[in-house]
UniProtKB/Swiss-Prot annotation:
UniProt organism field: Cryptosporiopsis sp. (strain 8999)
Name of this protein: Anthrone oxygenase dmxR16
Key word Transmembrane present: yes
EC number annotated for this UniProt entry: 1.10.3.-
Function statement: Anthrone oxygenase; part of the gene cluster that mediates the biosynthesis of the dimeric xanthones cryptosporioptides. The pathway begins with the synthesis of atrochrysone thioester by the polyketide synthase dmx-nrPKS. The atrochrysone carboxyl ACP thioesterase dmxR1 then breaks the thioester bond and releases the atrochrysone carboxylic acid from dmx-nrPKS. Atrochrysone carboxylic acid is decarboxylated by the decarboxylase dmxR15, and oxidized by the anthrone oxygenase dmxR16 to yield emodin. Emodin is then reduced to emodin hydroquinone by the oxidoreductase dmxR7.
């Protein structure tokens, strides 16, 4: 009779902390992808198909609205998972803390760099009958570049989280 191998001893233990990091890194990547989609697909469609500045502002406003409902909550939850992981990790706590801070950094980036453009677009929407398509396009393109830059924060957080979990699993 052949001896039974202990498969459980060969498989690295996942645990709650590592599962939290995997979830956080996954959520960071999903957030980055959703944000990049807006800049790389949605807004270019607005630019290619709109000839009416009021319609373009309305589309931008609705895109902002739905993104604002979903993405900040995911970002905060992701940061919480990274914080939990940092507190529970012995060796990679700095990497997990940095992943959380990096992911959450999109919030101050938004306040500092994007709020003026957002406010201008919202003011144009509230004013109603806007006639300068070129000006609206210029604002939307500026917002798109800022938004694409902002989407890098959760992407970097995801990379830090994934590299941290890979380092943990190697030990």
């Amino acid at each position: 009779m052949a001896p039974q191998t202990k498969r459980a001893a060969e498989t690295p233990k996942l645990g709650v902390q590592k599962a939290a990091v995997i979830a956080a890194a996954f959520l960071s990547a999903i957030t980055a992808g959703a944000m990049a989609n807006i800049s790389m697909i949605s807004v270019p469609v607005f630019m290619d198909t709109n000839t009416n500045p009021n319609h373009m502002i309305a589309q931008w406003s609705r895109t902002y609205h739905y993104g604002h409902i979903i993405l900040p909550g995911i970002c905060v939850g992701t940061c919480g998972l990274y914080a939990f992981s940092a507190l529970r990790s012995n060796k990679n706590w700095r990497r997990y803390a940095l992943a959380g801070i990096t992911t959450l950094s999109l919030v101050p980036f938004t306040w500092v760099f994007m709020t003026p453009t957002n406010n201008t677009l919202f003011a144009l929407e509230a004013a109603g009958n806007v006639s300068d398509l070129g000006y609206v396009q210029q604002l939307v393109v500026k917002w798109t570049w800022l938004h694409a830059t902002r989407s890098m924060f959760p992407l970097i957080g995801a990379i830090l989280g994934f590299t941290g979990i890979m380092a943990d699993l190697e030990r």
